[in-house]
Amino acid sequence: MATSAKLMLGSGLCQKLSQLTRQIHMQPALMSSFRSSREVQELDKYPEVEVVANPPEWRFVERLLPAKTVPQPVEKPKYPSGWQPQKEDGSELGYHVARTKNHMVPVYLHTRFRGQRRITVVRRVQGDIWTLEKDLRAVVEQSRNGKVCATRINELSGQIHFHGDHVDVLRDYLKEKGF
């Protein structure tokens, strides 16, 4: 294949290409940006720089930087998105569902087996998980017109699994309760 390519290009052009490739491969360090950069000059030739510990313009830069933690939400009577802040710890009920670090209700939908199996998961449950499961199962069965809903409880990790897609129903119920 190489000999047929040489015949097609012609002998003069082939020689020029081989010389060019030899030059490139023989001197890779000369073509780097380090070698081609200018040498360091005396400090007098560089412009003066004033180092300021707290410049007044820094507040504009701080607004652009992301916050290290999620800020506490501003108290309002009603939020336009429908979000509600978490109320008290729910000690009178015997259980508590803690919000996530982004102040969201921890109800998730897991899809398995190419979307055929849908499982709703309630996480971050503290306290009497069995009572919460009974209350949530009653809400889900009421939304399903009395059909039985299979549940699974993981007491150690504080999770309740519901068979089916019940994210909206459970999230609305937990928001009503103040979690």
Curated annotation (Swiss-Prot):
It comes from the Eukaryota. Keywords: Mitochondrion, Ribonucleoprotein, Ribosomal protein. GO terms for biological process: mitochondrial translation. Pfam families: Img2. Coiled coil: none annotated. It is found in: Mitochondrion. The keyword Glycosyltransferase does not apply. GO terms for molecular function: structural constituent of ribosome; translation initiation factor activity. InterPro entries: Ribosomal_mL49 (IPR007740), SUI1 (IPR001950). GO terms for cellular component: mitochondrial large ribosomal subunit. Component of the mitochondrial ribosome large subunit (39S) which comprises a 16S rRNA and about 50 distinct proteins. Belongs to the mitochondrion-specific ribosomal protein mL49 family. This is Large ribosomal subunit protein mL49. It comes from Drosophila melanogaster (Fruit fly). The gene is mRpL49.
